[in-house]
């Protein structure tokens, strides 16, 4: 039996029928066409499916869609900002590009959203705090030093309002 849910995704309200057994990642990718949320392991092991639910990182591959009712969800698509009718990358997204922290890109949405939640809680993290925050998001291509440096550079830019420091 389906269950009607109302949720807010990237600032847009939606009312949908959640199907039995449907996960949030499936709802986002297949029904709302938000394919930035990746599905890797479907076991909550890799973190590629991470989204923000009410500001906290959650692995969406095991999160029941019906539990998303009444929640505010942010996907990687929701981090980009509209400035004067033009879409711009969030400073975290820009930092990942500038610091070469992207290779295949599969894990990056989950890592960026995890980092975003970290920087909301702690705008000036240490490298160890960044590492700890990323412990549940796996990357097999880019390597963690570039990812950590990108997050620290974005943190500085967000804190100071200055342009992103290039590597």
Q: Which residue ranges define each predicted feature?
A:
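Signature of N-terminal electron-transfer/Fe-S-associated modules in redox systems
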Residues: 1-167
């Amino acid at each position: 039996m389906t269950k009607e849910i109302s949720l807010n995704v990237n600032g847009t309200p939606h009312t949908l029928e959640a199907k039995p057994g449907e996960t949030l990642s499936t709802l986002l990718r297949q029904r709302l066409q938000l394919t930035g949320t990746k599905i890797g392991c479907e076991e909550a092991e890799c973190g590629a499916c991470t989204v923000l639910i009410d500001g906290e990182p959650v692995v969406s591959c095991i999160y029941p869609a019906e539990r998303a009712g009444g929640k505010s969800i942010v996907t990687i698509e929701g981090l980009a900002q509209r400035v004067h009718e033009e879409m711009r990358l969030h400073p975290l997204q820009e930092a990942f590009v500038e610091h070469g922290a992207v290779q295949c890109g599969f894990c990056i949405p989950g890592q960026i959203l995890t980092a975003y939640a970290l920087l909301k809680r702690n705008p000036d993290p240490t490298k160890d705090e960044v590492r700890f925050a990323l412990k549940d998001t796996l990357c097999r291509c880019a390597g963690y030093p570039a990812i950590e440096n990108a997050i620290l550079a974005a943190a500085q830019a967000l804190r100071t309002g200055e342009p992103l420091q290039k590597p």
